[in-house]
């Protein structure tokens, strides 16, 4: 099914300042999710980064509701007394009836207040509540599915809490309850079944069935309309989970997804079209000077180079100054995350670099947690050898420096033959002998429990990337989350990303994709796909994404082999860039971080909440969406320093300019390119803020004769807007060098 080309509900004219802000004086927001102070997946990042902008809007009327976990409370939560009498009475009432409810402050930016429900302490009511769920919603939950049973307990506790909170308030506030994912969806269904006066929102960050189907190697997007969803869910033994998710989507006043591609998926699998798309953002920390993040890149790259020196000892026959670091990171879903496509493209890239005699070397990291039992001995030995060589060099350097100093002190030139004695040469020879190894550097840094059947390792064996000296592409599989306390690669994830040159995320199923978004915020170019939410968002809002270091791989309309070829082209073009071109591109990439800031994207969540209030309390709130002309779409323009395509830039008559007479130092003529970084940055900042907001909806509330009016955004759901200027025929970096 082709994607719609009409104006998107997440179009960037929404970055304009609103005339009025929402006044939550008599409204309370509860955001309910399984990952509140409980890191499991990407929803944790959404809640953690969004907390500040939501707290700024709602103040002390904003609460997060999640499960109690001992580890999470011990490391992330400061337990407190409830700040209001109503909330204190609510918690006391639930605790007196056999529940365990905790209250505190989540120790993250913004410091939001959290209500934590102890699911395990309420297991005594599981069978009764499962029976009530069956009577109310006709959803049966098998005894062996612990995750689904926890979802039932969490849902009933959440509903109990919301009902008790309303009962303890004499002046009933307008309550908005925002539920994330199916694990919290039971609570939403029960709120509607019990007719609680609550405005409900359900956000799906990925559909259950979509994730399972894509992992099963089916042609997912071309068959969305043809799936028998009940049959597919039943065959995968997730029918009860699917029913929870679908019921929550249909019961909610407002249903949202995180991207246009997921909206299409939800419409066919969950049988409800999302009311609004709420893209995921990040907390963007801007640098006071343009060169600061470039310096951080150099420092982090030096840390990675130290690891590479140790890992490839004995085979370090490539120039580290001409080495590029690529990486892929995320959940270990081999096909969904595109690791299969990345490996195939690396094999083809290796062939291209070898046959063309390139001096560039590529080290590709795979950061995907898998089952291991220990570190690889060879990997540990490599870091020990590197440290030994460093200590030996420092010892010899100190002795050499001392003798040189003494010789110069007496006014004579040193005799170089006497600067080092026999003992020093022996020490250096022993260090050199220690670097000799008979085997290739290891591909995997750990010992895998299922080495023979691991998808990444079996593919590496098939394509033959064994880190040999002849290979221009080296592969390192790190099956563990990065940590600054690791004895192998002692860097955290953020520092690692800053030190790399390119993030590669050729996902087949990626509802949003925080990894390429994090790369963008840190000024690191990345490759995404038109099947990921992030890729669609960038393709929609940027006229020429590749000029800004955002490469969009076509996995929607191309075959798997063609997608591999396109990815290989992207990688090879990137390898051909000069260092100066990469620096300029990183500057452009970092400037796109404004597009991903919660200060802007958080407004789509505001819109969803206002829409829910209008539907739940129509006597007090109104929401009037305006129709939008699709021609009013806005796209972030190409950088002014990027030349247009040759067909558009050719002179109509023979013409010779002063620029043509300037010397061109390299084959690409890079040093003749006039480029003012500060001027470029100023233009891009104006481009973000300049567009006018083409659609408005009023959301007014009346309480006791007073009215509040707020402007919120809405619009028809779609995918890609119409470009405002012609695009060049190609999207690779080759265009930038023409």
Curated annotation (Swiss-Prot):
Positions contributing to UDP-alpha-D-glucose binding: 205, 211, 331, 510, 512-513
Origin species: Mus musculus
Top-level taxonomy: Eukaryota, Metazoa, Chordata, Craniata, Vertebrata
Top EC class of this enzyme: transferase
Modified residues (Phosphoserine): 8, 11, 412, 641, 645, 649, 652-653, 657, 672, 698, 709, 711, 728, 732
Pfam families: Glycogen_syn
Superkingdom of origin: Eukaryota
Mechanisms controlling activity: Allosteric activation by glucose-6-phosphate. Phosphorylation reduces the activity towards UDP-glucose. When in the non-phosphorylated state, glycogen synthase does not require glucose-6-phosphate as an allosteric activator; when phosphorylated it does.
GO MF annotation terms: alpha-1,4-glucan glucosyltransferase (UDP-glucose donor) activity; D-glucose binding; glycogen synthase activity, transferring glucose-1-phosphate
Residues with the Phosphothreonine modification: 722, 724
Quaternary organization: Part of the GYS1-GYG1 complex, a heterooctamer composed of a tetramer of GYS1 and 2 dimers of GYG1, where each GYS1 protomer binds to one GYG1 subunit (via GYG1 C-terminus); the GYS1 tetramer may dissociate from GYG1 dimers to continue glycogen polymerization on its own.
Protein name as annotated: Glycogen [starch] synthase, muscle
PTMs per UniProt: Primed phosphorylation at Ser-657 (site 5) by CSNK2A1 and CSNK2A2 is required for inhibitory phosphorylation at Ser-641 (site 3a), Ser-645 (site 3b), Ser-649 (site 3c) and Ser-653 (site 4) by GSK3A an GSK3B. Phosphorylated at Ser-641 by PASK, leading to inactivation; phosphorylation by PASK is inhibited by glycogen. Phosphorylated at Ser-641 by DYRK2, leading to inactivation. Dephosphorylation at Ser-641 and Ser-645 by PP1 activates the enzyme. Phosphorylation at Ser-8 by AMPK inactivates the enzyme activity.
One cellular-component annotation, GO: cytosol
EC number: 2.4.1.11
Annotated Low complexity bias: 698-738
């Amino acid at each position: 099914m082709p994607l719609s080309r009409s104006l998107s509900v997440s179009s960037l004219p929404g970055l304009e300042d609103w005339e009025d802000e929402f006044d939550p004086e008599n409204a309370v927001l509860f955001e309910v999710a399984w990952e509140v102070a409980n890191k499991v997946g990407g929803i944790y990042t959404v809640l953690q980064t969004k907390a500040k902008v939501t707290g700024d809007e709602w103040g002390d009327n904003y609460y997060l509701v999640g499960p109690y976990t001992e580890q999470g409370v011990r490391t992330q939560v400061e337990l407190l007394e409830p700040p209001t009498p109503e909330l204190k009475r609510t918690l006391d009432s639930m605790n007196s009836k056999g529940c365990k409810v905790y209250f505190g402050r989540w120790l993250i930016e913004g410091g939001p207040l959290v209500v934590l429900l102890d699911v395990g302490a309420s297991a005594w009511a599981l069978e009764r509540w499962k029976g009530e769920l069956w009577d109310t919603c006709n959803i049966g939950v098998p005894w062996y599915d612990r995750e689904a049973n926890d979802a039932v307990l969490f849902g009933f506790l959440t509903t109990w809490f919301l009902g008790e909170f309303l009962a303890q308030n004499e002046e009933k506030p307008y309550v908005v309850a925002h539920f994330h994912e199916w694990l919290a969806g039971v609570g939403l269904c029960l709120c509607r079944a019990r007719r609680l006066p609550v405005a409900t929102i359900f956000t799906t960050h990925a559909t259950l069935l979509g994730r399972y189907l894509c992992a099963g190697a089916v042609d997912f997007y071309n068959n969305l309309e043809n799936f028998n969803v009940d049959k597919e869910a039943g065959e995968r033994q997730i029918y009860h989970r699917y029913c929870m998710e679908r019921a929550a989507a249909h019961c909610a006043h407002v249903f949202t997804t995180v991207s246009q591609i997921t909206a299409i998926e939800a419409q066919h699998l969950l049988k409800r079209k999302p009311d609004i798309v709420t893209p995921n953002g990040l907390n963007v920390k801007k640098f006071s000077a343009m060169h600061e993040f470039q310096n951080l890149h150099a420092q982090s790259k030096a840390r990675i180079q130290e690891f590479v020196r140790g890992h490839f000892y004995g085979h370090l026959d490539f120039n580290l100054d001409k080495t590029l670091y690529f990486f892929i990171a995320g959940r270990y879903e081999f096909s969904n995350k595109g690791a299969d496509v990345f490996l195939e493209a690396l094999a083809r890239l290796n062939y291209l670099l070898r046959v063309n005699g390139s001096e560039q070397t590529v080290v590709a990291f795979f950061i995907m947690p898998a089952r291991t039992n220990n570190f690889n001995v060879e990997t540990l030995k490599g870091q020990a050898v590197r440290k030994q060589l460093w200590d030996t060099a420092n010892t010899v350097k100190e002795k050499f420096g001392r003798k040189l100093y003494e010789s110069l002190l007496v006014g004579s030139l040193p005799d170089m033959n006497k600067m080092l004695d026999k003992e020093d040469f022996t020490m250096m020879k022993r260090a050199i002998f220690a670097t000799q190894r008979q085997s290739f550097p290891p591909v995997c840094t750990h010992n895998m429990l299922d080495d023979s059947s691991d998808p990444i390792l079996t593919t590496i064996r098939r394509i033959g990337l064994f880190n040999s000296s002849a290979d221009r592409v080296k592969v390192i599989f790190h099956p563990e989350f990065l940590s600054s306390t690791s004895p192998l690669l002692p860097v955290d994830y953020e520092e690692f990303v800053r030190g790399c040159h390119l993030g590669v995320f050729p996902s087949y199923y990626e509802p949003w994709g925080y990894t390429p978004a994090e790369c963008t915020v840190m000024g690191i170019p990345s490759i995404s796909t038109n099947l990921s939410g992030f890729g669609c968002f960038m393709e929609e809002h940027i006229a020429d994404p590749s000029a800004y270091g955002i490469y969009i791989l076509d996995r929607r309309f191309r075959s798997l082999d063609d997608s591999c070829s396109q990815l290989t082209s992207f990688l090879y073009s990137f390898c051909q860039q000069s260092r100066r071109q990469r620096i300029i591109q990183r500057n452009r990439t970092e400037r796109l971080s404004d597009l991903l800031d919660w200060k802007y994207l958080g407004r789509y969540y505001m819109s969803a909440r206002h829409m829910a209030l209008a539907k739940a309390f129509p006597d007090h709130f109104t929401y009037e969406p305006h129709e939008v002309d699709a021609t009013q779409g806005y796209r972030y323009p190409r950088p002014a320093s990027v030349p247009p395509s040759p067909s558009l830039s050719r002179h109509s008559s023979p013409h010779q300019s002063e620029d043509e007479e300037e010397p061109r130092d390299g084959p690409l003529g890079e040093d003749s390119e006039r480029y003012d970084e500060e001027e470029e940055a100023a233009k891009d900042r104006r481009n973000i803020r300049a567009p006018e907001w083409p659609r408005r909806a009023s959301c007014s509330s009346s309480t006791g004769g007073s009215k509040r009016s707020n402007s919120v955004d809405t619009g028809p759901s779609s995918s890609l807007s119409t470009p405002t200027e012609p695009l060049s025929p190609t999207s690779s970096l080759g265009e930038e060098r023409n």
